């Protein structure tokens, strides 16, 4: 995948009917959103509902609503996905019958009864999926070793795409405090990643 392709370009291509553009968007944001969803779900909910189920529902909702999305800045798409993820997680907590919801969502794909629906997206081979899941598990373990304050600012900045000002407002702290905490958190996280890579 070409990471040089901008989110704005991919959104516009999808709006013009390029289904492959959505697959590229999915690939570009999958990992960030997976981490975000993991930490937004309660342990109890994660025990009953797979993060991947939530992600699939988020991306289905995004595909259906992307025509109404307006790109504003580099963080706006991730912020939009984050809002969809929040809604999806709340919905999952209220409704435990995941199979019924999945069937309803899948009916929207192209079929004999819906010939104009989008094609189901083939995201990856089984070996690629396994490698991505293993990589995601390592990332989550490394994030879990951080103090809660560090983990929170990293999630807000790098996975939700909030600016320092937005994080400051969200946490009720000064911009300088947030910037310093984020700097320290990222430094600590890099150290943890390097240590894990050596093992």
Show where each model-derived region lies.
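Structural recognition of an alpha-helix C-terminal capping motif at a helix-to-coil junction
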Residues: 49, 53-60, 75-87, 180
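N-terminal module of bacterial RNA polymerase sigma factors
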Residues: 1-31, 67, 119-123, 127
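DNA-recognition helix of helix-turn-helix
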Residues: 139-141, 150, 159, 164-196
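Short, charged helix-capping/linker segments at alpha-helix termini
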Residues: 16-27, 35-57, 174-175, 198-199
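Amphipathic alpha-helical segment used for protein-protein interaction
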Residues: 33, 120-155, 162, 170
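Arg/Lys-rich amphipathic alpha helix in sigma70-family domain 2
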Residues: 68, 86-107, 118, 132, ...
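Sigma70-family region 2
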Residues: 12-16, 39-46, 59-74, 95-97
């Amino acid at each position: 995948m070409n990471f040089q392709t901008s989110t704005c370009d991919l959104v516009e291509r999808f709006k013009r009917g390029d289904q492959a553009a959505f697959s590229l968007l999915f690939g570009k944001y999958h990992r960030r959103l997976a981490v975000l969803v993991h930490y937004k779900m309660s342990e109890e909910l994660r025990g009953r509902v797979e993060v991947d189920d939530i992600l699939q529902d988020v991306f289905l909702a995004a595909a259906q609503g992307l025509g109404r999305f307006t790109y504003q800045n580099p963080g706006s798409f991730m912020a939009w996905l984050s809002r969809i993820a929040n809604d999806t997680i709340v919905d999952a907590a209220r409704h435990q019958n995941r199979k019924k919801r999945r069937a309803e969502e899948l009916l929207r794909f192209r079929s004999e009864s819906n010939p104009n629906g989008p094609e189901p997206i083939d995201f990856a081979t089984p070996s690629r999926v396994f490698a991505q899941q293993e990589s995601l598990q390592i990332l989550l373990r490394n994030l879990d070793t951080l103090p809660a304050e560090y983990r929170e600012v990293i999630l807000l900045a790098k996975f939700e795409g909030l600016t320092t000002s937005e994080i400051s407002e969200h946490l009720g702290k000064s911009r300088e405090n947030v910037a310093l905490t984020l700097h320290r958190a990222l430094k600590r996280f890099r150290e943890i990643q390097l240590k894990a890579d050596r093992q």
